[in-house]
A protein has these predicted regions:
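Metal-dependent phosphoesterases centered on the DNase I-like endonuclease/exonuclease/phosphatase
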Residues: 186-228
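Catalytic metal-binding/acid-base residues of hydrolase active sites
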Residues: 27, 87, 173, 215-218
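Bacterial Sec-dependent N-terminal signal peptides
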Residues: 1-16
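A Trp-anchored, charged/polar loop motif used as the substrate-binding/catalytic surface
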Residues: 64, 147-157, 191-198
Length: 228
């Protein structure tokens, strides 16, 4: 899943500057090493995927090409990239070290999540444009399931050309067990994010809030059209 958004920010001289923001589900970007604390055995040399260094480097190269193609089309690197399905900080460091992405000088905003498979969400951002002021990870709560574990919501905030921005990236629970049976989980995540967004705008109506992620729902579904 890849989503590209363009927006403009008025500069100090009242001229609008176009910027690109991207969300990219990296679809199981795992390293080749077994993490004894998560269920990542599938992505090891002896696992079901026979995941080895050659396959890992090829995947990194493919991701590099996609992001560089976006930069080529827009004539500039995206200023913020939200990502999901990444195993750890190391795989992100490997990604931003790819030759065609080095020029962007991306920095990372990442937190480990309690997800059983060990996958996280995170941000890559250009510090020359987005002036980071802070970040946090927030547990997504489903009240009906107090022991439920999923990917945390990652947030970061700062300014772009002096304007306040707040970014949120999340990866909502899947449709495992059926769409209708699992809908309440995604609805709960959407409502929690809506509460955060409303709180931010109540505190400062000038804040630009950017919500991105893999919601495992369609725009017409209740979680997106009503709860969010």
């Amino acid at each position: 899943m890849l989503c590209v958004a363009l927006f403009a920010v008025a500069s100090a001289v009242a001229q609008e500057k176009p910027y690109t923001v991207v969300f990219y589900n990296l679809e199981n970007l795992f390293d080749i090493y077994d993490d004894p604390e998560t269920h990542d055995e599938e992505f090891t040399p002896d696992g079901a995927k026979q995941w080895n260094e050659i396959k890992y480097q090829k995947k990194l190269s493919n991701m590099e090409r996609v992001l560089f193609d976006i930069a080529a089309i827009q004539k500039d690197y995206p200023i913020v990239i939200g990502v999901s399905e990444i195993e750890n900080r190391t795989v992100l460091e490997d990604l931003i070290s790819q030759p065609k992405l080095k020029g962007a000088n991306y920095r990372l905003c990442h937190y480990d999540s309690p997800d059983a498979r060990g996958v996280d969400v995170a941000f890559l951002y250009r510090a020359d444009v987005f002036k980071l002021e802070g970040s946090d990870n927030i547990k997504l709560v489903v009240e009906e399931l107090p022991d439920f574990r999923t990917r945390d919501l990652v947030t970061m905030w700062g300014t772009i050309d002096g304007e306040p921005f707040y970014f949120l990236v999340s990866h909502w629970p899947s449709r495992l067990g059926g769409k209708e049976a699992s809908q309440f989980k995604r609805d709960a995540c959407a409502k929690q994010i809506r509460e955060i967004k409303d709180s931010l705008l109540n505190e400062n109506p000038a804040t630009k809030v950017v919500v991105m992620g893999d919601f495992n729902d369609d725009p017409g579904d209740k979680s997106v059209s009503e709860c969010l």
